[in-house]
Amino acid sequence: MSASRFMLRPLTRALLMHGATRTRLAGTGLGLALTLTAAPYVQAQEWTLNIPSQPLAQALQTLGQQTSLQIIYSPESLQGLRSTALNGRYQDDESLKAMLNGTGIRYQRDGNTVTVLGPATGSAMELAPTNVNASRLGATTEGSNSYTTGGVTIGKGVHSLKETPQSVTVMTRKMLDDQNLNTIEQVMEKTPGITVYDSPMGGKYFYSRGFRMSGQYQYDGVPLDIGSSYVQADSFNSDMAIYDRVEVLRGAAGMMKGAGGTAGGVNFVRKRGQDTAHTQLSLSAGTWDNYRGQVDTGGPLNDSGTIRGRAVVTEQTRQYFYDVGSRKDQIYYGALDFDLSPDTTLGLGFAWEDVDATPCWGGLPRYADGSDLHLKRSTCLNTAWNNQRSKRATYFADLKHQFNDDWSLKVAGVYSRNTQDMEYAFPSGAVPVGATATNTLMLGSIYDYDQRDYGFDAYVDGKFDAFGQQHELTIGANASRSHKDDFYAVAALPQRQNVLDPNHHIPQPDESYYLANASRGGPVDMHIKQYGAYSIARLKLADPLTLVLGSRVSWYKSDTDSVQYFRGEGTQVDTKSTETGQVTPFAGVLFDLNDNLTAYASYTDIFTPQGAYKTIDGSTLKPLVGQSYELGIKGEWFDGRLNSTFNLFRTLQKDAAQDDPRCEDSSCSINSGKVRAQGFEAEVSGEVIDRLQLLAGYTYTQTKVLEDADATQDGVVYNSYVPRHLLRVWGDYSLSGPLDRVTIGAGVNAQTGNYRTSPIGGDNIDGAGYAVWNGRIGYRIDDTWSVALNGNNLFDKRYYSTIGTEGFGNFYGDPRNFVMSVKADF
C-alpha cells in the first residue's frame, strides 16, 4: 500500500472525514474536488491503485485520496461519465490517462496540481483512444473490467502470464460475473482445456491433458487436500461470490504441494477489503425457479484507511430441469485487512457455506446393447426423499511484510471443515432391448461425512544482483493435513424402479436397514499429512534469456482405518503409507524474442503416493510417477491487457493404481503400466480490439496406453471420455456511440465425440460431439443500475454432457435456459 496514507496532515484528515469537496476557486469556475497534501510532488511518482470503474467525479476523488495529486475539476462537466478501472502499479500520468480514457476529457498539469478540462487545444493533454492501454493490470482482477490479468500467484510471488513457463488460465471476476459462474463446477466447465465429467455419486471430476485433477487446490497459495479424498468427486460446495479470481494450472503441479497430480491445480484467490467504499447489490431470476440475491460491501473502516473490511452475503434457491431436484445455498463471508505499518499487512477472513439439496444422482441407464433410451431430459430416477445437507466453515489468515523494494515475506494459513449428511437412492441396471417396463434394482445409501483440512505456507521472495544481471529467488515451506472421519453404507432396496415410468415415492428405509443389508460401506478414519520445503530461482542469464529452476523436498504420511462391508460381511482394512525426502524438480527456460513474444520450455516431475491402495498380499502400492514436458510461445500486447499462448505438451505416467482382477470385491489393486498424453493448446485472453474482451481456448489431446499389466490393452486409448478436440470461447463487446450503454456477449462450448468401454460386454458406448452456444446482453441504466439477460444453450441442443455405462451414469446437458439479473453499485 502507499506510504502516503501514513503521512496525511491533520487538515487533510479532517477534509476526508467531512467530505470537503467542490470549494469554489475564484476566477476559474471550477470545483475543487479534493486537495491532498500528503507529500511534496516528486517527478514520476508511482502508486499502487485499486479504483473500480465508477462515476468519473467519484473516481477522481478516490485518485486524489490514494495519491498526492491535487485534482481540480468542474462537477457539471463530468456528469454521466464513467471512469476506466485502475488496478496495479502506476506512475502518476499513467493513472490519469487511463482513468480519463474514452471520456473526451483532457487535463493540464502543473507540478502536483491537475486541472481537468473539457475539449481544449494547446497544452492540454490530448487523450487518444489507445491510451486505454497506458497502464498495466495488476494481479487483482476485481474492477479491472478485463478477461485477463497482469499477474498470477498460483506459483510463488507474482509473475505475468508471459513470465510463467507453464500453462495458466485465469478466470477473472468479470468473466465469472458476465457468465453467472457461481460454482466451481460452472467455472471449470468454461475453462479452456478442462473436461468436466459427472460423478454418479454427486459432484464432478475435472480432467486436464487426459488426466484427472485430484486434490490439487490452493487458497491464496496455501495447499489443501480438499478433493483428494472427497465424497463429491473433485468438486466441493464453494460459491464463487467470495473470490476475486480462479487460477487454473494445466500440467503437473508437484511444485504446488509435493505430492503433485499429473493434470494440474487450482488456486482460489479471495476478495479483500477495498481501499475505497463500495457496495454492490445484485438480484437474479431464471428458468426453473432459479433465484439469487447478493450483497457485497467493503471499504476503509478508519479515517486513515489502515483497516479495511469486506462482507459478502449470498442466498440462492433453485429447481432443475429434471424432476425432483432442488437446492438452497447460503453463503456468508467476512474479511479484514490491517496495515500494521506501511510495510506490513495482516489479513483475516471467514466463510460459512450451507447447502440443503434434493439431488438427482446416478444419472440415466441405457439399453443393454449400449444404445440410447431417448428418455425425456426431465427424467430423474431418484426418490423424492433424496437429501444432501452440507456445511462448510473456512478460516483464512495471512501476513505480508515488505522488507524493502526487493524483498518480501508472506505467511499464510487456512483451516476448513466440511460436514455432510446424505441419504439417496438411484437405479442401477441396463434396460433390456425392446422393454416397455423395467424392474430395475434400486441402490440406497447413507453417508455421514466430516473432513477437516489444514494448510500452511511461508516464503520469502526477492531480487538480487549478480554477474551484471538481476535475478529472483523464492525460498519457503508449506504443510497440509487432512482428517476424514465418515461412515457410509450402500444396500439394495426392497422395491424396484420402472425406468420407463419412474416412481419418486419408493418408501424410505430407516438407518437400521442399511446397517443390516449393506453390500459395501463402513466407517473410515483417514489421516493425511504432508510437509515440504521448496526453492525457486529465476536466473537472468542474458537480457533475453531466463532460466527457472525449482525443487521441493517432501515428506508424506497417510493412515487409514476402515471396515469394508461386502455382501453382509465386514473386514477390517488398515492402510499406511510413508514417503520421506521425496525430491520434485522443476526446470524452465524463457527466451524473449521481442517485447511481445517469449518462447519457453519446461519440465516437471510427477510423484503421487498411493498409500490408500493395497496389493493382494497386503502391501502398500508403490507411488505413481511420471514426467511432464511443455514447449511453447507466449505473447503479451497492449501493456499486458492481451495475452496469448500456444504450446505443445507431453505427459508420461506410470504405476497408477487399478483394480486387481484377482480380487472379487475390488479391495486390492495393482500398479498399471505406462500411459502417454500429448497434444497442443492455443489460448487468447483480454482485449483483442477496442471494447472487445475475449477468452478463447482450443485443446487437442491424444492419449494412449503404452504398456499395461493386461497386454491386450497396449496401444488403446487412455481415458477415452476425454475428447480429442475441445473449444471454449466467450467474448463480451461494449457498443459505442448512441448505444454505448449496451454490451453484447456470446460464446460456445464445443467438443468432439467421446466414448466409454462397457464393463459388461466390452463394447464402446459412444457420446456424440456437440456445440452449445450461449449469449448475453447487458444495459447500463445509469451510473448505479445495470441489467443483463443471459441465455444458455440458445439453440436448445439435446446432448449428453457425460457418458456412463449401460446401467447408470449418463447425464443430459442443461436445456435452453435464461437468467435475468439486476445490479446496483454504490
From Swiss-Prot:
Q: Motif location (TonB box)?
A: 110-119
Q: What domain of life does the native source organism fall in?
A: Bacteria
Please provide the record's keywords in A-Z order: Cell outer membrane, Ion transport, Iron, Iron transport, Membrane, Receptor, Signal, TonB box, Transmembrane, Transmembrane beta strand, Transport
Pfam families xrefs: Plug, STN, TonB_dep_Rec_b-barrel
| Record localization | Cell outer membrane
Q: What is its main location?
A: membrane
Q: Which residues form the TBDR plug domain?
A: 160-271
State the species of origin: Pseudomonas sp. (strain M114)
Described purpose of this protein according to its UniProt entry: Specific receptor for the siderophore ferric pyoverdine (pseudobactin) M114.
Q: What is this protein called?
A: Ferric-pyoverdine M114 receptor PbuA
In the bilayer, the protein is annotated as:
Multi-pass membrane protein
Cleaved signal peptide residues: 1-44
InterPro entries according to UniProt: Plug_dom, Plug_dom_sf, Secretin/TonB_short_N, TonB-dep_rcpt-like, TonB-dep_rcpt_b-brl, TonB_rcpt_b-brl_sf, TonB_rcpt_CS, TonB_sidphr_rcpt
Q: Which CDD domains match?
A: ligand_gated_channel
* PANTHER family registered for this protein in UniProt: FERRICHROME IRON RECEPTOR-RELATED (PTHR32552), HYDROXAMATE SIDEROPHORE RECEPTOR FHUE (PTHR32552:SF74)
Q: What family does the Swiss-Prot or TrEMBL record give for this protein?
A: Belongs to the TonB-dependent receptor family.
Molecular functions per Gene Ontology: siderophore uptake transmembrane transporter activity; signaling receptor activity
Q: What is the residue range of the motif TonB C-terminal box?
A: 809-826
| TBDR beta-barrel domain segment(s) | 276-826
